[in-house]
Amino acid sequence: MFAENNRISWSQMHCQCLLAALGMGLIWGIPEFTGREGAVGILIGGVLLVLWSGILRRQMTVFRDPIRYLGKVPAWLIAGIWESYLVLTGGWLVGKVGHLAGEYLVSGVPETLLSLIFVLAALGGSHHVQARGRLAQISWGVAAWLGGILLLLAAVQNSPSLEMVWGDQHLETTGFDWKRSVKSIGKYVAYGSGIGLMTWLTVQVRDSKEKRRKEGLAPAIGQLSLWFLTGAVLLTVNFGTDATTMNTCPILEVMAGVELPGGFLRRVDLIFLSILLFSLVFLLGSIFFYSNYVADRIHISIGRL
């Protein structure tokens, strides 16, 4: 059904998932998962997402031709739900990025103009399945290494606070809020609900000689959960559970206090922000891509705008 040169590998699928989720998760997601309750929510929520991704992967045959296996009305209904999800997410994202860039990157520029530039940058990316896979594979390697090193520096420089907040003495004197933990599980599962879109694209993942353990989205979900957990711990160390009430971006406030060895670069937060903004551009590009791709799967042609 698909030409071999129009397929991607599981590794490229993982990189697309991680690159698209990283920016939004670290900027707006992790403040909801501070404290031990948030950490438990991430871990249990990650397990639930892995189980759900396994169920979705078994539906690959159905999504090769939804109209054939489900019928026209059910296929259109499912596609309509996902299209609504993409439109709402895209609109929310464009507004948030305009505000973020105006506050942290360039001041004095109208947020509407910044949002427009963001949209044009996302539209300028490749819309071809295989090209997007290669772009994500290369970009994720750079983003993961650079972002990981900066987060590691932040953790090392906050190590005394880490011991104080997560030490045994603190755990003994603080109760565990199970109700908040359950809410965190629900929030994390809701955040990861977008993996359902990957089901539409897995039909174009080629059957190669990759090891079975690389198939499916479980490795990507596991890595993403580690990123969330690291960011949430750093926010807990610096702001406690008050990160959700902050008017600023908590993770960027943490990175603003990070100093590189030798002190040759003082604005580490701008490097970290650049990584996250690139992730957000890729995410919006993915929204445009899937809005057209899902429609194509049910034999409807729509413009990207």
Model-derived segments and spans:
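N-terminal hydrophobic signal/anchor transmembrane helix of membrane proteins
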Residues: 1-40, 125-136, 252-254
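Hydrophobic, membrane-embedded alpha-helices of multi-pass small-molecule transporters
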Residues: 6-28, 41-45, 49-53, 82-86, ...
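Membrane-interface helix-boundary motifs at transmembrane edges
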Residues: 63-73, 129-136, 205-218, 296-303
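Small-residue-rich segments of transmembrane alpha-helices in multi-pass membrane proteins
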Residues: 74-83, 139-155, 223-229
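Membrane-interface interhelical connector segments
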Residues: 238-269
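Membrane-interface loop-to-helix entry segments
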Residues: 97, 101, 111-112, 124-154
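Structural signal for the C-terminal ends of transmembrane alpha-helices
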Residues: 57-62, 123-130, 154-158, 202-209
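Membrane helical hairpin/interfacial module
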Residues: 24-111
